[in-house]
């Protein structure tokens, strides 16, 4: 699946924010919250179609710079997503398992109705919660991902810093479990 043009524009806007940022992120209380690979055009504010819709619409990230390695074009840049820690800590975080308690599939559906119902059952709002899930690749279910929904990205909680070379990325992996998302992770 491909992201909508709205989400593509959202990614481009986030990327443009990081390019214009003159302040060292370490001095603003920012933390690394995820990574992804993106074409150079996205890193510099041009519209681009991205992949994915497993747990909803938005910007998909992985905990490390290598999370989307197999899905990215060879010349894709390495992007690090950062957020102000105080603001990020206030954002609700939820795991989205593959199936709900009624054994109904939630991943890769035409709409987000079941996911929204699941998030609401955890007493959170779907449009203001970060979503986490396993990123299945065949039988390997050890990878994880985070989805930044459009409403959160629109509020400019996040900045993106992109690097042409992998070795230029100094940020280490993020540990999603340390943020204690609500809900069932699944397997």
Q: Can you describe what each PLM-predicted range is?
A:
Residues 13-31, 36-43, 49-57, 69-187:
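Conserved NAD+-utilizing ADP-ribose enzyme module
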Residues 1-10:
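Classical eukaryotic N-terminal signal peptides for Sec-dependent ER targeting/secretion
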């Amino acid at each position: 699946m491909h992201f909508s043009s709205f989400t593509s524009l959202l990614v481009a806007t986030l990327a443009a924010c990081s390019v214009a940022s003159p302040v060292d992120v370490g001095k603003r209380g920012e933390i690394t919250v995820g990574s992804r690979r993106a074409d150079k055009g996205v890193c510099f504010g041009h519209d681009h179609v991205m992949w994915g819709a497993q747990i909803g619409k938005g910007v998909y990230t992985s905990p490390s710079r290598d999370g989307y390695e197999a899905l990215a074009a060879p010349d894709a840049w390495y992007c690090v997503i950062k957020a102000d820690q105080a603001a990020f800590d206030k954002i609700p975080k939820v795991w989205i398992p593959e199936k709900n308690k009624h054994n109904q599939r939630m991943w890769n559906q035409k709409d987000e109705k079941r996911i929204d119902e699941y998030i609401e059952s955890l007493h959170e709002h779907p449009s203001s919660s970060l979503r986490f899930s396993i990123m299945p690749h065949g039988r390997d279910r050890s990878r994880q991902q985070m989805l930044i929904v459009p409403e959160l990205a629109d509020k400019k909680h996040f900045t993106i810093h992109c690097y042409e070379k992998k070795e230029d990325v100094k940020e280490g992996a993020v540990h999603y479990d340390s943020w204690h998302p609500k809900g069932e992770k699944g397997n």
